Amino acid sequence: MMIENLLIELLTEELPPKSLDKLGNAFAAVIADSLKSQNLTTPDTILTAFASPRRLAVHLTAIPAQAPDQVVALKLMPITVGLDAQGQPTPALHKKLAALGMENVDASALKRVQESKAEMLFLEQNVTGILLAAGLQKAMEDAIRQLPVSKVMTYQLDDGWENVHFVRPVHGLIALHGQKIIPVSAFGLTAGNTTRGHRFEVKQTELIIDHADRYASLLETEGAVIPGFDRRRSWIREGLEAAASAVQLRCISDEVLLDEVTALVEYPNILMGAFPTDFLEVPQECLISTMKINQKYFPLLDTDGKLTNQFLIVANITPADPGQIISGNERVIRSRLADAKFFFDHDRKRTLASRLPDLDKVIYHHQLGSQGERTRYVQTLARIIGRLLGDDNLAGQADQAAMLAKADLLTDMVGEFPELQGIMGRYYARFEGMDETIAFAIEDHYKPRFAGDVLPRSMAGICVALADKLETLISLFSIGQLPTGDKDPYALRRHALGVIRILIEKNLPIGLDVLISRAADVLQDEMIGKQDSGPGHARPVTPQLVGQLQDFFYDRLAASLRDQGYTAQEVEAVLNLRPSLLCEIPRRLAAVRAFAALPEAASLAAANKRVGNILKKSECDATVAIDEACLQASAEITLYRALSEIESDARQAFQNGDYVTALQILAALKAPVDAFFDQVMVNDENEALRRNRLALLMALQATMNRVADISRLAA
């Protein structure tokens, strides 16, 4: 069996840059998976994906020319159906074999296999392995069909009649097994061994790939194309760093921009340009956004992190004299920066406060009213949170920042660059002479914007950020706009995680239930909360709605904690109690982990689970106190005394926030708990004894589950 390395390439017109890497990896993965499912790979097969602006390709090592032959066992029917009492084939078996074209097979050649319900007849067949050409044709069809393309193009083949649907028109197809061309076809093309190099950097129109292993090297040396996405990306990164270092500056790190530029060039060339220093009077975030978003440039910073007037260009050609390219890019960026300066100067002619009435003309959501109404809601809630977390001074700062937080949405700069919302609000607030605390709170109320983002810097910013996120959540919940599956158009999961992170990482002594309750109260008091429930309106705030939102928060918290490395049992143990103060959760989790390491932990967790099951099935009255005089069995007396001895210390440790000690104290209960369940019948026929023992178990459960529900740790 001949084994060689395999190469597949689709030569296309320019592919969508933002999805190029994803397309390349998906194309390669489906080809490999399809070949593997047809036994056309080996244990030594290694996949390498290629993706450049005009090509998708995959290289696979150790691919056989034909799949190995296989013995396939085909289940026919139960023996009782296929053979009669004398062991002769029944008409049903004859009919089945005839349908398979195997009517000449002797019944004695059939294999008998005992399965769970009956003994079955199997027909073993030798199946010849599929040839690579046929298997690769199927793999190509699978890859083309499964490629994750959001929008496809429709174009006609050269015959002018047949339409083809694909992400971009395809002009070439390579399929090489070593040096041999595999005659697969797709898009009206039959595979060959020729491709094309760079559009402008090479003279020859076609490049012959003489072996699957020489694809990347030939393209790079003779075609002026670096086909590997990761290699091209590393080349660009190193070039940017070297160019910046040469002038003692630092290039802004932006992985998204780096990916996009990597998808735009085939053979990158790093050039440096500059713009007039007058533009540096504009906030550097505006200039950076202009350069990155509009022009795909990489801005350069000085050692203090301040923007300079120099920038790096990743060109797709390498001319002898780069001056024309640089001057052309400088001319374009001057126009772009002039626009940014105009926006900045024009915006400052109006105060943020003067823009507030215009927010009433901007729709927030057709069922929730305007941005002006939303702003007043957030303002009220921020003021309440400020009082809960501080004093009237903090409440006043939160009120002012919340009032102005959305005003920059109406500025020209944010209209051009929406990602600058909040940031421009800070600049304009400082320009008006506002206190730095208010200015930073305006910017920070959007934080955290994404996973791993920094949190608000001040308490005022925290108050407004919490209010803004809670408003979004409860308002959208009130109109039934909940996330479903992987769809979350309003980023409600991100908003919930933002609230969770702020409460935990800022160690805020305020309960989640309190925040949700206050948010619900404000929504109910606002005009939107008073509208009739029905199409086009928010529903009234009900206890069910509040409970639904609380469940959503704890679900997001559980997922986040598991992502941080906590086990499902640890997370369930803590969150099953629904602790309101989220800032305590890390300490509770640490205590649970320490408790689980104790030798007594497994036994106590199992006992706690048993206690829970008994109490769940029993009609116990939580108001019934333990009657010491009613304790009869020595084991229940011992348990009662042991519980009484540790109860005070456990409660004190819990109140002091020493959760590790509060749980480790429980270790003393192992022996008396084990003895109790070995020697005492809880559901005694005597009602007084039964009620007393249930009361003892309730007290035991309350003590054991103060920090966490340790029954969740049971195996």
Swiss-Prot record:
Molecular functions per Gene Ontology: arginine-tRNA ligase activity; ATP binding; glycine-tRNA ligase activity
Keyword Coiled coil included in the entry's annotation: no
Cellular component terms (Gene Ontology): cytosol
One biological process term in Gene Ontology: arginyl-tRNA aminoacylation
InterPro entries (alphabetical): DALR_anticod-bd, Gly-tRNA-synth_bsu, Gly-tRNA-synth_heterodimer
Pfam families named among the record's database cross-references: DALR_1, tRNA_synt_2f
Entry protein name: Glycine--tRNA ligase beta subunit
Organism: Nitrosomonas europaea (strain ATCC 19718 / CIP 103999 / KCTC 2705 / NBRC 14298)
